[in-house]
Amino acid sequence: MTIKSLLPFIAVTFICGGSVLVEARQPKSPSAVVKPTAKPTVSQPVQPKWKLFTPPDGRFTILMPGNPNRETQYQKTYMGEINLEIFVAQPPKQQVAYIVTYNDFPYSYGEMSDPQAVLNDARDMALKTTQSNLISQRNIRSSNNHPGKEIEYINSGGKITKSRMYVAEGRLYQVMAITTKKQQKTLAKTITGYLNSFQIVLKK
């Protein structure tokens, strides 16, 4: 997985309820290539150096494996232009991507919207657009008591996504780890630690 292959599948999306959602769509797995039989070379993955990351606006902190790449996407909507900020970190020689995205709602919409409805719609849209099956879900709260939802799902290509979504101060955050079945087993504790490290910083 490369950042170029991931970014086109992350976008601001609307559904019939009018909610603005961040959807993470995973690319389809490439067709299998037949290779001559040979004993594979086993190489140990390079352990990344994790460090605390804070975005330019200072509204959250999270542990990331190195400096994430940043991408900004702009979407015109009936509420005006919505900016989607995307941060992606991918350790070398590991089939995993650590992603944080957020988008701000217009003030009036943020005041009126039901956080749980936004979270439920985000879950449904993620499953639909990635053609995935839900593995587990639970309602959660951020460390400063903002509503959230954790979901885990798998698509037909075997990619597993574990995501925590939060609605706070007119903003929808999504914190995700996308990996393969094989890597998920070895990275389960690392992914949990990554998700647990996410902290929302309230506006002053």
Regions found by a protein language model. Give the residues of each.
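N-terminal "mature-domain start" segment
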Residues: 40-83, 142-145, 192-199, 204
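Boundary at the C-terminal end of the N-terminal hydrophobic targeting segment
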Residues: 22-24
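A short acidic-to-branched-hydrophobic micro-motif
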Residues: 86-117, 173
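Bacterial N-terminal signal peptides
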Residues: 10-17
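Signature of long, low-cysteine stretches enriched in small and polar/charged residues
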Residues: 63-89, 122-168
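Surface-exposed amphipathic alpha-helical segments
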Residues: 68-70, 117-130, 171-204
